[in-house]
Curated annotation (Swiss-Prot):
Ca(2+) binds at residues 63-64, 99, 334-335. This is N-acetylglucosamine-6-sulfatase. Its EC number is 3.1.6.14. The gene is GNS. PANTHER family: N-ACETYLGLUCOSAMINE-6-SULFATASE, N-ACETYLGLUCOSAMINE-6-SULFATASE FAMILY MEMBER.
Length: 560
């Protein structure tokens, strides 16, 4: 299957004759421009003569792929070609367990409260005109292209509302992308429309030419063969899998017939001592609900087999073209997922490990094989890390994340964070759900059994802390209960026991203060020492206003 019209007599290497760029064409920069790029941006590059040897970067992004429930199990080739050839992170998190806010954080290196991207709608700033004007010029791909001279290639799902007529339609190509093959709106496998450098192309339901994961694989291989060889490249390939509707390729539709959703300790149990949205789930789940989520779990794994094929093809092509040894490859997901945990059928959005923890595998120059890192990283670190690879200083950006390139290269005596912020603004319907008339307005994502996965006051913020002594999660809800959840994940990895009422009050106060600090952080202040870091300083007076009242928690309809 080929998406690009390639000349039969075209050599297999060379400039992009038929790959037309999404923004104005990106020829190799003249020597003076290259010098300006080096001096003004990517200072890590040691001279124009070495520009062709700057590292390439590939970012592979899955959609809704969990880590906690075994989401990497189907990806045997991916684990062998990336994880075993480099580093696997066992503590990788997202700052918001929902597609658009998480993807916006990846692109910008910022927490949701600094983006005001709060959900998957235009009103929630997902690919809105405001996002396009304020944030897109400052994404790390835009910096790679404008300041570092990288060719930039995108293929797949961008943001959930991309292509909306009220926000430029499919003609909008975000600043910073040389080659643009973006899916209109949310993940599909057939019957979708792509923006090919700003021009719409419809696809049907013929597997050989339309199955989206394979389409993305083929157009990516074409880019590798027909790009310019005079400049480094960055590729972002964003697959639909394993997002619903979970349509597997024909050859994989009978795979994993004996696989079921994991029956771990928090499967199909009541969420005791948790906030009301979790407590409202019906326990035990009905047989029909369990059959549904088992089927969904199986189909999710089936769709990932095509992603595994994509990764294999990509790595083999990089090797064939002589570029593999000079290319960093990242594999991750935008959020986790749950299937029956605390009797919630299927979704993401919640604060628990299964929704906020994601796979992260990296290989590349200077990374030793077969490594596992326990260092606490987040998807806001991807942009800073990739810019660091390109030689661009994080200090020139307003990003909240940190570069973990030193971790990848085995730096010793490294000063690193001990906590990250997780924040989410709940969504609800203004009217009663017609399928569940007994429920009040304000809930959403409801299933036929009238179990709802979201609500207006499912709005929370958490500090996820990992240090030598502590493995904690502290969360506060913006609801009438003023609910707090705290978990010691060393003793309670499945988050069964909320210890908010039994934990040391002094520690609780420190965590509350740290949460407020992180919710108001921006740029460098997001990287200050956490509660358990040696450099941390706690002044309880800062928790009180001049009037002596306890400082209020920082929630608003825009998450700050």
């Amino acid at each position: 299957m080929r998406l690009l019209s390639l000349a039969p007599d075209r050599p297999r290497r060379g400039g992009p004759r038929h790959l037309t760029s999404g923004s104005p064409a990106l020829p190799p920069p003249p020597p003076l421009l290259l010098l300006l790029l080096l001096l003004g941006g990517c200072l890590g590059v040691s001279g124009a003569a070495k520009s062709s040897r700057r590292p390439n970067v590939v970012l592979l992004l899955a959609d809704d792929q969990d880590e906690v429930l075994g989401g990497m199990t189907p990806l045997k080739k991916t684990k062998a070609l990336i994880g075993e050839m480099g580093m696997t992170f066992s503590s990788a998190y997202v700052p918001s367990a929902l597609c658009c806010p998480s993807r916006a954080s990846i692109l910008t290196g910022k927490y949701p409260h600094n983006l005001h991207v709060v959900n998957n709608t235009l009103e929630g700033n997902c690919s809105s005109k405001s996002w396009q004007k304020i944030q897109e010029p400052n994404t790390f791909p835009a910096i790679l292209r404008s300041m570092c001279g990288y060719q930039t290639f995108f293929a797949g799902k961008y943001l959930n509302e991309y292509g909306a007529p009220d926000a430029g339609g499919l003609g909008h190509v975000p600043l910073g992308w040389s080659y643009w093959y973006a899916l209109e709106k949310n993940s599909k496998y057939y019957n979708y429309t792509l923006s090919i450098n700003g021009k719409a192309r419809k696809h049907g339901e013929n597997y050989s030419v339309d199955y989206l994961t394979d389409v993305l694989a083929n157009v990516s291989l074409d880019f590798l063969d027909y790009k310019s060889n005079s400049e480094p490249f960055f590729m972002m390939i964003s697959t639909p899998a394993p997002h619903s509707p979970w349509t597997a390729a024909p050859q994989y539709q009978n795979a994993f017939q004996n696989v079921f959703a994991p029956r771990n300790k928090n499967f199909n149990i009541h969420g005791t001592n948790k906030h009301w949205l979790i407590r409202q789930a019906k326990t035990p789940m009905t047989n029909s609900s369990i059959q549904f989520l088992d089927n969904a779990f199986r189909k999710r794994w089936q769709t990932l087999l095509s992603v595994d094929d994509l990764v294999e093809k990509l790595v083999k092509r990089l090797e064939f073209n002589g570029e593999l040894n000079n290319t960093y490859i990242f594999y991750t997901s935008d959020n986790g997922y749950h299937t029956g945990q605390f009797s919630l059928p299927i979704d993401k959005r919640q604060l628990y490990e299964f929704d906020i923890k994601v796979p992260l595998l990296v290989r590349g120059p200077g990374i030793k094989p077969n490594q596992t890192s326990k260092m606490l990283v987040a998807n806001i670190d991807l942009g800073p890390t990739i810019l660091d690879i390109a030689g661009y200083s994080l200090n020139k950006t307003q990003m909240d994340g940190m570069s973990f390139l030193p971790i990848l290269k085995g730096a010793s005596n490294l000063t690193w964070r001990s906590d990250v912020l997780v924040e989410y603004q709940g969504e609800g319907r203004n009217v009663t759900d017609p399928t569940c008339p007994s429920l009040s307005p304000g809930v959403s994502q409801c299933f036929p059994d009238c179990v709802c996965e979201d609500a207006y006051n499912n709005t929370y913020a958490c500090v996820r802390t990992m240090s030598e002594r502590w493995n904690l999660q502290y969360c506060e809800f913006d609801d009438q209960e003023v609910f707090v959840e705290v978990y010691n994940l060393t003793a309670d990895p499945h988050q069964l026991n909320n210890i908010a009422k039994s934990i040391d009050p002094e520690l609780l106060g420190k965590m509350n203060y740290r949460l407020m600090m992180l919710q108001s952080c921006s740029g460098p202040t997001c990287r200050t020492p956490g509660v358990f870091d040696p450099g941390y300083r706690f002044d309880p007076r800062l928790m009180f206003s001049n009037h002596g009242s306890v400082r209020t928690r920082r929630f608003s309809k825009h998450l700050l």
